Amino acid sequence: MQGVFAKAVPEIFSCESGTPGYSFYFDLIAPVWRNCRAEGAIHRLCSLMRKMGAKTLLREELEPNDEIRQEFEDLQTRVGKTLPSEPSAIRFSFFAAPCRDKDKWRDQLPVTSFLGYAVVLRAELPTDVPIVKERCPSGEMAYVLEAATRPPAWVSENGNGGYAVAGVTNYYVHCQREFKTTIGPRGASREYAPKGAFFCQQNGLTHVCAHAALRMILNTAEGLVDHKVTNRELNEILGIDHRKTFASKGLSVEQIREITDHLNLNVLAADFITFPTVDYAEWIYPLVESGYAVLLIFNPIHTEGHVVAVLGHTMNSDKWDCEAHLAYRPEAFGTYHASAAWVDHFVINDDNFGMYTCMPPSYLRSKVLPQYDLTQRARFAIGFLPPELDVPPYFAEKASIGIVRQLRGVLQPNPGNRWLQRIWEQLDQPQKGIVARTLGCTKEQYVAHLKATVDSDGHGPVSAISKVLVNAPDHLWLTEVSLPDLYTANKHKLGDILVDARAGKHGGQPMLTYVWGWLPGLQIPDNPRPGVTPLSWPLTGHIPVLRQAKVLGPCHEW
């Protein structure tokens, strides 16, 4: 929280694992949360800091800024009474570095050792108010107004007075940015800036889980809004008057769309109740892989909905079912392997359970039709995209695989083109199939990717780019074609299909527009058909898949 100062010099604690005298639970959680029920998120924060090797904790009571004052004012308006005692805001800041001399904390806690911070609001509520009895029976409320930490990583001294960060294996947080925070009192402060995702909690009285999920996305994803989004702003957009309105069942999809429309955001939406045959994980994954956050609405139980922010994914290249499901039941699982099959978790921020938690896709896949049971089922998803992008990548991927299959029907490969021959063989065997991985990219990114690539046969980099590609639209959906073993072992591919990320219109209906593509040794023609000879292409082997550089960083992969 930038520009928000402490009332006094920070309290400094040694919190290193194994150090006598400090417990995250008894010394941090219990005194602040006491009888409050919403402590799952702070437990997650402390567990994350413990695993990342936190050695020093700073605790400060803050001078309230406008946002903090608004939170307390709205709470008082909601309960309709003066709060029994003065509410407070506490900031916790975590460092991987030890602090041997507490008077010199600004010198001894380097920027590279900063793991993250959390601002917690505390308020005592009058227990004779019905809504307080229902929602906060103890009268003691505490919740995270704002937090930002590094994604899960190993943080260690690098020997040069700084700290090195190595991301957790196969753990990708695609949506992140830098968050500046000011630690210390006025005149004796220092600024730190972790790079990660924004986190916050609902308080259940003036804002709910949808507020939290929206704020986590809007305050993290770059290019969506030009200011920090607060709970009061969202309530004002919806015309919520805390003296009259209480969102006891959360916000509706229509209210969420009212907010996105008011902020002039470009979104893609999917209704998995109306279209239960659309696999929600296959719909979400290309957006997340592209760096676009997704708001996911689901039912933990039949009668209750919940909203979370999807910011990344983990990958398990050893998953058994990715190939086995097609091998054993090809009639039930389609004609190709969506790369989403190797996603073993979506990385989500859940205001109930904390930041960077891992939700397995299978948790929200129900075999019962939605009209009979909504329990543990994805209901609705909203992806937040750059302006003008209106083609769902889910459909771009299906169309791209259709083009490859269409080409297979009219073209026999040259006997020397072994990799194209291998693709055709996989396509011809229902129990084998090919892999499709779809993500968004700009034309500039894609051209740079090709020009920097040498294939497994030693061909490349590609110096002559197709004229079609030079004149391509700026925003594209890229579907990469691979084989299961090649994708999981090498993270390599054997071809690309590019689709315009903006839908053309024909008779008022959106249309997918094929731009260009290649497979080993050839360029894929528009509308492959008998008698059409594909143009040659210099790459005949496999090349690395395209990565979004912002999520790679120093990390381990398997």
Where on the chain are the PLM-derived regions?
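Residue-level signal for functionally critical sites in structured catalytic/ligand-binding pockets
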Residues: 179-186, 203-204, 306, 329-332, ...
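Short loop/turn segments at secondary-structure transitions that flank enzyme active sites
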Residues: 215, 220, 302, 314-316, ...
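Noncatalytic regulatory segments and standalone regulatory/sensor domains
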Residues: 1-173, 315-558
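Generic detector of well-ordered alpha-helical segments enriched in charged/polar residues
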Residues: 46, 69, 73-76, 235, ...
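Glycine- and small hydrophobic-enriched segments that form the cores of compact globular domains
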Residues: 174-270
